[in-house]
Amino acid sequence: MTQVSFSRRDAFVALSATATGGAFAAPAQAKAATQPTHHRTVSIDGIEIFYREAGPVDAPVLLLLHGFPSSSRMFRNLIPALSDRYRVIAPDYPGFGHSAVPDRASFKYGFARFAELIDKFLTELRIDRFALYVMDYGAPVGFRLALKRPGQVTALIAQNGNAYEEGLRDFWIPVKAYWADDTPSGRDKMRGGLTLEATRSQYLDGVADKSLVDPDSWLIDQMLIDRPGVSEIHLDLFKDYRTNVELYPQFHAFFRERKPPTLIAWGKNDFIFPPEGARAYLRDLPEAELSLIDSGHFALEDKGEEIAALIRDFLGRKLKR
């Protein structure tokens, strides 16, 4: 098993990841009891998995699963806003953030493997009940996890994390073409989605006040993408995303049968997963609470305080301590 090393960038990203400040603050009642955020690693199947953790060890668990091209860093402000009440845990997938980057020759990058590792991660941490926050890639990882542990999901929070065909619109036309094209030229066409311009647009498109979005977010994400070999990992994941769509009927059956208390907090201006994908959840979860927020894909960046308040209210009503 090999890991990619990026020396000086490691130091810069580590500094940025632990810096304070951001787009929002914890609610006043939480500030006095804010818990420190710990930055830890655990070995799962010989792979070092990095995770952030905060909150009382005996509190209800909230598992945060990040999207592309980000990492647990996207939750840097949400974690302290919730950790007075909950044990908040946010891991990085292999190839993302501070987790190890195993070589593609020895590790199959895909959503099934990610879900398997997160399942083992929870076992290692002795967690058998958890609320689930899913965003972007976190949705298929989290819902695959839910299929493995159907009785352990205490609540669901979907923030621009899709599970319906209605949410796969114009942005997905070239991606679907890539699914059907196994040629090198088809793969090369997707490299435009790994540029700084593409990463920046994920953060800024659909945001009214762009000055609220920390530019470190897209710069750090891009530095991590630009590590040797990592772009190939992302192209593998773009291809593998089709396996998530194939599982949509199973996800929907889980929703209908288990009826987890659900909050849908969705940046309504998201060009990747538009609000049609948010509304589609109501077909299988008619009791879900839907909040369409005036933001884009990474809604925590500019509307984090609003989302944190929604989560505190929702979990306060739905979870028993």
Put a short name on every predicted segment.
Residues T2-A19:
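N-terminal secretory signal peptides and thylakoid transit peptides that target proteins
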Residues P69-N77, V88:
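Serine-hydrolase catalytic-loop signature spanning alpha/beta hydrolases and amidase-signature enzymes
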